[in-house]
């Protein structure tokens, strides 16, 4: 699609959301872009996307580099690194998890930068166009679609909807719990998982000997239902690949 309005947001989100999982407050970000040839217009779009993401995450865009590498890279490659901090001894590691602890899920905004190999295979099989109106109703109470086209919402816009940045709700929760004014003690925030590659199986990484059971899952986003149906992907594989709305 060559639509880069959301990729900077995805890049920052993947970094800061990972920091949150150990209880760290993100404070700064640097980016690196490698391209086969200079494209000022594309660079400007990505730069604006990175700046918007840092604004949402309340962090400083501390610097970055763009390298033109003909013969080494054939497509644009964007990467980044975020820096965060937490008080010594306040890291959240999951080692204190116990049987009976409660899982609280936060809604996702879409696919969240993972599972696109399977998405591309399903798209090829379905024959649907990314630039045409979405073949399903994308409305969902827990998210908005960030538009980069006018008119009907396209399938491409839904599948590229930027990753949600969770800094505001989680840092506020962590700070309140540390200050003794939150809904629980900081020691009761025992683990956090960023549902990325591997889907909900990421929860298994939180503890070596504990499993989990979600008896009241968040509503599944409509694009996941469409992908499962058009790709004949079973429920287990969908949950091992995608966040499914959480």
Where are these regions (language model features)?
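Short loop/turn motifs at secondary-structure junctions
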Residues: 23-25, 118, 188
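Glycine-/charge-enriched secondary-structure boundary and capping motifs
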Residues: 42-60, 73-76, 139-144, 148-158, ...
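Glycine-rich, flexible loop/turn motifs
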Residues: 1-3, 29, 58, 65-68, ...
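Short, acidic (Asp/Glu-rich) active-site segment that either coordinates a divalent metal cofactor
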Residues: 91-155
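Glycine-rich phosphate/pyrophosphate-binding loop regions near the starts of catalytic domains
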Residues: 1-109
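Glycine-rich beta-alpha junction loops
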Residues: 84-86, 107-113, 120-123, 163, ...
């Amino acid at each position: 699609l060559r639509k880069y309005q959301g990729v900077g947001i995805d890049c920052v989100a993947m970094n800061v959301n990972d920091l949150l999982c150990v209880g760290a407050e993100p404070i700064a970000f640097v980016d690196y872009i490698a391209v086969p040839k200079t494209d000022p217009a594309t660079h400007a779009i990505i730069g604006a996307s990175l700046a918007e993401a840092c604004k949402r995450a309340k962090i400083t865009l501390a610097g970055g580099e763009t390298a033109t590498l003909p013969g080494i890279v054939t497509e644009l490659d964007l990467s980044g690194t975020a820096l965060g901090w937490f008080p010594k001894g306040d890291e959240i590691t999951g080692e204190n998890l116990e049987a009976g602890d409660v899982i609280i899920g936060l809604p996702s905004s879409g696919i969240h930068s993972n599972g696109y190999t399977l998405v591309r295979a399903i798209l090829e099989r379905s024959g649907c166009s990314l630039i045409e109106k979405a073949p399903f109703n994308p409305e969902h109470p827990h998210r908005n679609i960030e538009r980069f086209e006018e008119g009907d919402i396209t399938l491409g816009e839904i599948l590229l909807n930027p990753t949600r940045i969770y800094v505001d709700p989680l840092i506020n929760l962590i700070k309140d719990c540390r200050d003794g004014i939150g809904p629980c003690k900081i020691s009761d925030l025992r683990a956090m998982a960023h549902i990325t590659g591997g889907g909900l199986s990421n929860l298994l990484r939180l503890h070596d000997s504990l499993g989990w059971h979600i008896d009241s899952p968040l509503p599944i986003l409509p694009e996941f239902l469409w992908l499962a149906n058009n790709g004949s992907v079973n429920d287990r594989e969908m949950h091992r690949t995608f966040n499914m709305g959480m």
